[in-house]
């Protein structure tokens, strides 16, 4: 019931000006950040999350909404609730390290919210980097973790470089294939700067993230060529083809436009996130929609993530590095633009 009520509003929420607006049959309504935060927090506590975990999870979701990334914000909340309803999300997980060295670790998320597990694991990577220069953490037995950028940006608070990867539900066909064998498998790299804002690169390894297709499906929109293919393997602009057996395409769209490079990037994310940790990989990654049956075979545990933190002082003087990053960003931002 909670999921059903919230889905209608959350699936259409977006950021406008200083508040959030959602559309309904009676027109537009604006609610504040705090109102939305309190509502989402109450829903997560209702399913059994502690106040601390609920607040963290909502903070991760709203960090997407305030950046205009509607596909990864509170629109996802109903999906998490439905996964809890079918016992695929543990609201009170016992997150723990199952293997570690001074610079590496494997974390078991105990089927908890990825929104909670990911920051926990990233903090482990940061602590290791603080001790020995770099920290690398692979995670098993987790779930969808929201935007990768939130977790990687935690490193900025320590003047470190942050990295976050995750595998995802198999919706992507490798180059030349008609089978959905990989997820959108995003990569995020965050680099601190000096005077200016940091470098934050957060992207799917597909031409478009699944959330973008979901938005087009709700609006009956048209997808650009190179985003998806139908179940016969032909390029399509109909976003509903994805639900009819089609697939998302690797970054590049097709071989002629470099999709093999996107295929490689997505594969690397899958290997680092899952095979390195003992999570499920490839076509065996658990689907995000609760109504989609779980794969019959489960070679690993849950969804996998991978996090990294690098202490700049382990490579060179931090102030000199930041000065160079500022110069680099200035150079790129002041390039001559196309006419």
Q: Model-derived features: where do they sit?
A:
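Catalytic-core signal marking the mid-to-C-terminal active-site face
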Residues: 27-31, 36, 271, 280-339
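N-terminal glycine-rich anion-binding loops that anchor highly charged ligand groups
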Residues: 29-32, 49-75, 89-100, 297-302
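Active-site cofactor/substrate anionic-group-binding motifs, chiefly glycine-
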Residues: 73-126
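A generic, well-ordered mixed alpha/beta core segment in the N-terminal half of proteins
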Residues: 105-194
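Phosphate/diphosphate-binding glycine-rich loops and adjacent basic-rich segments that engage nucleotide
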Residues: 172-242
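Secondary-shell segments that build the walls of catalytic and ion/ligand-binding clefts
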Residues: 221-284, 288
């Amino acid at each position: 019931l909670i999921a059903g009520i919230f889905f209608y509003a959350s699936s259409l929420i977006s950021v406008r000006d200083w508040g959030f607006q959602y559309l309904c049959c009676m027109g537009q309504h604006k609610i504040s950040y705090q109102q939305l935060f309190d509502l989402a927090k109450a829903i997560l506590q209702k399913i059994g999350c502690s106040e601390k975990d609920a607040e963290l999870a909502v903070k991760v979701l709203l960090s997407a909404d305030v950046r205009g990334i509607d596909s990864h914000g509170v629109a996802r909340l109903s999906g998490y609730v439905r996964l809890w309803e079918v016992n695929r999300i543990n609201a009170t997980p016992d997150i723990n390290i199952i293997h570690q060295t001074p610079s590496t670790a494997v974390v078991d998320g105990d089927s908890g919210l990825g929104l909670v597990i990911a920051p926990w694991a990233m903090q482990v990577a940061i602590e290791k980097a603080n001790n020995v220069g770099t920290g690398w953490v692979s995670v098993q037995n987790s779930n969808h973790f929201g935007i990768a950028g939130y977790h990687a940006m935690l490193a900025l608070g320590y003047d470190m470089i942050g990295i976050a990867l995750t595998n995802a539900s198999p919706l992507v066909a490798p180059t030349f294939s008609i089978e959905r064998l990989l997820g959108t498998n995003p990569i995020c790299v965050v680099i601190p700067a000096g005077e200016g804002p940091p470098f934050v690169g957060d992207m799917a390894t597909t031409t478009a993230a699944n959330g973008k297709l979901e938005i087009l499906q709700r609006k009956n929109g048209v997808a650009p060529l190179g985003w998806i293919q139908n179940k016969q393997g032909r390029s399509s602009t109909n976003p509903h083809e994805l639900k009819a057996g089609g697939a998302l395409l690797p970054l590049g769209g097709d071989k002629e436009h470099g999709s093999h490079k996107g295929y490689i990037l997505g594969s690397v994310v899958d290997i680092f996130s899952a095979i390195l940790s003992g999570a499920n990989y490839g076509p065996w990654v658990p689907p995000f929609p609760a109504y989609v049956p779980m794969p019959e075979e489960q070679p690993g545990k849950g969804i996998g993530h991978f996090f990294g933190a690098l202490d700049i002082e382990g490579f060179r003087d931090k102030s000199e590095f930041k000065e160079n990053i500022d110069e680099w960003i200035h150079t790129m931002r002041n390039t001559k633009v196309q006419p």
